[in-house]
Amino acid sequence: MSEALELLGQDIVARAPGVLGHSVAFGELTIVARAASVIDTLTFLRDDAACRFHQLIDLTGVDYPERAARFDVVYHLLSLVKNHRIRLKVSTDEDTPVPSVTPVFPVADWFEREAFDMYGIFFDGHPDLRRILTDYGFHGHPLRKDFPMTGYVEVRYDDELKRVVYEPVKITEFRAFDFLSPWEGAKYALPGDEKAQ
């Protein structure tokens, strides 16, 4: 199987527009392409007789804050005819939008909105690029590695005001909970054990 994927990868690199390279790892083919040519590359992968990747299964982002091109946009494709899966990766930074692939795969609409909402990756030409999982007034992008784990605001329902309120996050004091299980056979003495003897 990996030999067939290696041959397919070599064929795609030789003939597809904008492809920079390929690799096969753990039985999966990964193609790396230029972000500017992602529409042409995906159109080739969909329409070429040797590929026939007619389904876009998923589109997501990956954050590498130490790189200049911080984000990878990863497209997972499936060919039911050839019984192959493929991964296409393109890199971009925080300011450079990636062309929207909704003209090639309409299902990418909500996937791109999710990548925008969670990572802040912009998609040029998207028909409706707005938040999909977080509130409209939400600040930041929660799946970025520099986003604080506590977030910026706390959202709760206030019974007195009868509405949802947003408050700055308050870090509570650190508490260590030591739950001792009597079934684990503790060998040390606890306060009050002297009374039992």
UniProtKB/Swiss-Prot annotation:
Assigned GO CC terms: plasma membrane
Catalytic activity of the protein: a quinone + NADH + 5 H(+)(in) = a quinol + NAD(+) + 4 H(+)(out)
Enzyme Commission code(s) on record: 7.1.1.-
Compartments, as annotated in UniProt: Cell inner membrane
Membrane topology recorded in Swiss-Prot or TrEMBL: Peripheral membrane protein
Catalytic class of the enzyme: translocase
Classification via SUPFAM superfamilies: Nqo5-like
Record key words, sorted: Cell inner membrane, Cell membrane, Membrane, NAD, Quinone, Translocase, Transport, Ubiquinone
Gene3D superfamilies the record matches: NADH:ubiquinone oxidoreductase, 30kDa subunit
GO molecular function annotations of the record: NADH dehydrogenase (ubiquinone) activity; NADH:ubiquinone reductase (non-electrogenic) activity; quinone binding
InterPro entries: NADH_DH_suC, NADH_quin_OxRdtase_su_C/D-like, NADH_UbQ_OxRdtase_30kDa_su, NADH_UbQ_OxRdtase_CS
Family the entry assigns: Belongs to the complex I 30 kDa subunit family.
Subunit-level organization: NDH-1 is composed of 14 different subunits. Subunits NuoB, C, D, E, F, and G constitute the peripheral sector of the complex.
Function: NDH-1 shuttles electrons from NADH, via FMN and iron-sulfur (Fe-S) centers, to quinones in the respiratory chain. The immediate electron acceptor for the enzyme in this species is believed to be ubiquinone. Couples the redox reaction to proton translocation (for every two electrons transferred, four hydrogen ions are translocated across the cytoplasmic membrane), and thus conserves the redox energy in a proton gradient.
Name of the protein: NADH-quinone oxidoreductase subunit C
